């Protein structure tokens, strides 16, 4: 299994946001019996594009290029995880932290928390997307650039 240090190496620095994604991944692994996703077995739909997403990429193997990391932007620290193998899913929503903390205090707080104490566990409300599809490419009549068929009108 990947480690916190793997997440830091990928992201470039330690921070509270990275910790959120790392701990969300650990909790999803526990709740859904997940393993690192070599292909599209694990799907994550993130409701933000903040630092925590990097932790999820490292820990679970979700990526935009593979089509198993998607964004449903709502500005929330919430992540829906899906196990295609078992058909199970969960939505983890970050609980509010104590008010008035500095960045350093927030980081220390999140580092000290158990994942179960950080997140509310809810049903995933976004339908599991279909597996990524490959599209033919065509030269666009307007610009002359090669474009995926799904974008040509």
Predicted regions span which residues?
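Long, charged N-terminal interaction/targeting segments
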Residues: 1-126
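Active-site helix-to-loop segments that bind/position phosphate- or nucleotide-bearing substrates
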Residues: 129
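Short metal-coordination and nucleic-acid-contact micro-motifs, chiefly zinc-binding Cys/His arrays
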Residues: 134-136
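Short cysteine-rich clusters marking metal-coordination/redox-active sites
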Residues: 140-144
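Short, non-ligating residues that shape and space the ligands of small metal-coordination modules
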Residues: 149-150
């Amino acid at each position: 299994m990947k480690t916190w240090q793997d997440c830091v190496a990928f992201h470039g620095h330690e921070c509270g946001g990275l910790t959120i994604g790392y701990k969300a991944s650990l909790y999803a692994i526990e709740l859904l019996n997940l393993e690192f996703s070599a292909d599209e077995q694990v799907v994550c739909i993130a409701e933000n594009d903040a630092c925590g997403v990097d932790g999820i990429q490292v820990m679970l193997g979700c990526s935009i290029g593979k089509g198993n990391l998607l964004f449903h932007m709502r500005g929330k620290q919430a992540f829906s995880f899906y196990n295609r193998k078992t058909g199970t899913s969960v939505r983890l929503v970050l609980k509010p932290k104590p008010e008035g903390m500095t960045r350093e205090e927030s980081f220390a707080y999140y580092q000290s928390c158990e994942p179960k104490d950080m997140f509310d566990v809810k049903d995933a409300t976004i339908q599991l997307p279909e597996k990524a599809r490959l599209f033919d490419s065509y030269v666009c009549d307007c610009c002359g650039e090669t474009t995926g068929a799904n974008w040509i009108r």
